[in-house]
Amino acid sequence: MYDDWRVMFNMLEGMYHNHPVKIDIAGTVETIAEITAEKLYEVYNVFYNLNNMILCVAGNVTVDGVLKVADKMLKPCEKKEIKNYFETEPYEIKEPYVEQTFPVSMPLFNLGFKEKADKPLNEKQLACTDILLSALASNTSMLYRNLMDSNLINSSFSYELFEGPGYCSVIFGGESRAPKQAAEMIKQYISDIKKNGIDKEDFEIARKSVYGDSVSSLNSVSAISNSIIDYAMQGNEIFAYIDAVANAKLEDINSRLAEMLDVDNCTLSVVKQPDEV
């Protein structure tokens, strides 16, 4: 849905000063009109290059069989190294609040916490982050129950780690009749948890949940290949991540909590009806 898209990109525009992750890739009428055949070929030849690709095949195949097909179908190309260059991105957010009016049945919000992104997270950091977020905001968490009991969210509420080259953020969001109140409750809950640490029982529930989801995803051949690619692009390995989840300790999670979710470095994005206050 376009409104979901808009609330997220407004948040990214409020968080990031320079990083291109904030740019709406759908473009505008003006930018699309500027596209030429020469530009398309330039982009194609730079990025759709065998030296800039990873091939992953999952299923009832052999290495020799895959290589035979690849050698037949893939066009040889000039060997080149692709490097990305990004402007320096400060740690601090650009704007704490972004709002847009749009014809929606209920206001939407994204609360994004900007994280350090000097280098990609490794398997242990990813595992600890996923367990931490599950303990904080899954539908079995105290935060989720408090938000629901206060009628500040509904079942659309979600959370995610949004990470890539040069950017990293944690996002909470969904539909809310009072987005600012929901955001304040989330920030206050995080502040309280930072003082006391994650409860051991909550940690165990979250660790088992993340581990179970990770293992069950291996039932899907397409999920396996997608996961291998996703992790490989960041220099990681899916099975090392699963092992890290299985071996995670409570102190690892609390250590990760201390490193992230700075309540003074977050952006609230809201999309609401024009006549709503």
Describe each model-derived feature in a short phrase.
Residues M1-I82, E99, C128, T140, ...:
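Charge-rich, well-structured scaffold segments of protease-associated domains
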Residues E13, I82-M142, N146:
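His/Glu-based metal-binding/catalytic segments typifying zinc-dependent metallopeptidases
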